[in-house]
């Protein structure tokens, strides 16, 4: 259902403590993100954008505030419930692809299914479906260390998708890719959002922000603007899918 509210944060605070010094990484962050959106979180280095992403991913607990996921305050869950929720509802893509080098693509994608207690009989079908979404089903039994850089990151996206999560979180997912592979990965993420997944990316690249539906800007831990119309990107235009490089070209 389009316009379904997936994420709502209410006065979200994250503080870090360095001796007697308090570092305010997030200050009363209030955001809403809907199903099928591809949203960029942007801001200067040290602004709190990655902190917000990690709080949304339940990797860093907030100091105060509420985090509602489909209307449920998941901060009230036990640690065990949060871990199960994270494995089933969230998918992660990081800047440095962390596939296990001495394992096959299948074995890498099987791990989150094992953690989510998926029965063995259905795992291969789920893995092939996820790989097909990024054009890599033909690599399912290949060693991950034999993949190109772009293929490894696409396999990482497939791994994020394998449990059919509601939310994909990416922390600079194209940071180590060249321009050609960056365009491929971003268009694949846009296609994933069009299929009803919600995609949230931390990025410092204006062109990636321009490819998103919306930009949330953060400065000094505070949300200072929310919406593409509030963020002017000079000499960058939003590309249509036909302008992007196709997967078959690599």
Report residues per predicted region.
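Short, low-complexity, intrinsically disordered N-terminal peptides in bacterial proteins
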Residues: 1-2
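ABC family nucleotide-binding domain
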Residues: 5-218
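Conserved beta-strand-loop-alpha-helix hinge in the C-terminal portion
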Residues: 222-248
